[in-house]
Amino acid sequence: MKILIPTAKEMNTDLPSIEANPLRPESQAVLDALALYSASQLESFYKVSAEKAVEEFQHIQALKRQTAQHYPALNLFDGLMYRHIKRDKLTEAEQVYLENHVFITSALYGVVPALSPMAPHRLDFLMKLKVAGKTLKSHWKTAYDEALKQEEMIFSLLSSEFETVFSKEIREKMVTFKFMEDRGGQLKIHSTISKKARGAFLTALIENQVQTVEEARRLSFAGFNYREDLSQPQELVFVKEV
């Protein structure tokens, strides 16, 4: 069983660095394509300020020169979902579960274990980067499928932009999750609720060593409980009353 989570734009590099792994060929091809952009071109590519574009340019060039600092990916990313994941003071069993089951989907590194070394970078599948004439999704599809072809059970905490990198055959194995708030009988869903809840849900999976859909249904976390009446066999809905 594998649990898939996305990358995040926000990063925290105030961490001890770790040794890098050699880049796989698919990653090197993406890096080579990114490295063709000047800082001013990156400003429009990323739709960021000139200052931010220079920072990203430096990240890319450091990766090219193999001088970039690397950090465990789960600790490097620091978006809302990540800040709600239990990332330290793990028991030995929780650490083993995390290492065996939690994987990050990256547009630069592929599908990798959550504690894999990553360097700071900014890239997702909505960005219009061409790699040898292909979109990022087309470039990664074979490698993404290969990473999961042996899996019978896949828990996806991904947004659709990441899920659609996988073939239909792989997506059909995925169990997805929806997190909603019940405000006086009105069910609400928005990205802030979803991101926080994904992190809290992953924490509950880790703490309870969940291996099956049935075990996931029984979880209660951060005020969320499973709602059978709103769920489908491959989409579990959790609701928090506020």
Which residues are covered by each model-predicted region?
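Active-site helix-to-loop segments that bind/position phosphate- or nucleotide-bearing substrates
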Residues: 2-89
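Internal, well-folded beta-alpha domain core
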Residues: 86-233, 237-242
